[in-house]
């Protein structure tokens, strides 16, 4: 299961970003090109193993866009994107967030109190982005059916679990200067 994803992760090049070894992958970076078969495999898996009884799919730009698009096209469920730019629309939610890599603001539009959403993201490391996003959505009165992240690295999933936020990952990895290794199933994937 998820063989295309696992194989592509093992081939991912590694670069150094500050003190972090960072993997470059189509699903997390859009580089190199995203293979439609990879996106198809991932979206099929998410649809099969997620609670799809939702009003909306919500994902984070930039790399959440192809994921949400693929799922939306297959299910007919509309999607909204958490943006890094403010639009000043009525009901816009502003989130100040900090991750292991950056700080900044995110903006949510098109989600209303009482909505039930599937939250999809490309990668989790520290859990910072999801922590702030979940808190903002809950304060707005939005129900999150599932949180699905394609690639888990670091201890973000465990940190969020300790705060009562359950995140499902498709694949958990370890990244070193030598490359990406796939970790054994953690039981959090489905």
From Swiss-Prot:
One GO cellular component term: cytoplasm
Subunit field text: Homodimer.
Reactions catalysed, as given in the entry: IMP + diphosphate = hypoxanthine + 5-phospho-alpha-D-ribose 1-diphosphate; GMP + diphosphate = guanine + 5-phospho-alpha-D-ribose 1-diphosphate
Family per similarity comment: Belongs to the purine/pyrimidine phosphoribosyltransferase family. Archaeal HPRT subfamily.
Keyword Glycosyltransferase listed: yes
InterPro entries assigned: HGPRTase-like, PRibTrfase_dom, PRTase-like, Pur/Pyrimidine_PRTase
Single GO term (MF): guanine phosphoribosyltransferase activity
Gene Ontology biological process terms, A to Z: IMP salvage; purine ribonucleoside salvage
Name under which the protein is recorded: Hypoxanthine/guanine phosphoribosyltransferase
Gene (name only): hpt
Intracellular or extracellular location(s): Cytoplasm
Biological role stated in the UniProt entry: Catalyzes a salvage reaction resulting in the formation of IMP that is energically less costly than de novo synthesis.
PANTHER family: HYPOXANTHINE/GUANINE PHOSPHORIBOSYLTRANSFERASE, XANTHINE PHOSPHORIBOSYLTRANSFERASE
Keywords noted in UniProt: Cytoplasm, Glycosyltransferase, Purine salvage, Transferase
Pathway assigned in UniProt: Purine metabolism; IMP biosynthesis via salvage pathway; IMP from hypoxanthine: step 1/1
E.C. numbers: 2.4.2.8
Cross-referenced Pfam families: Pribosyltran (PF00156)
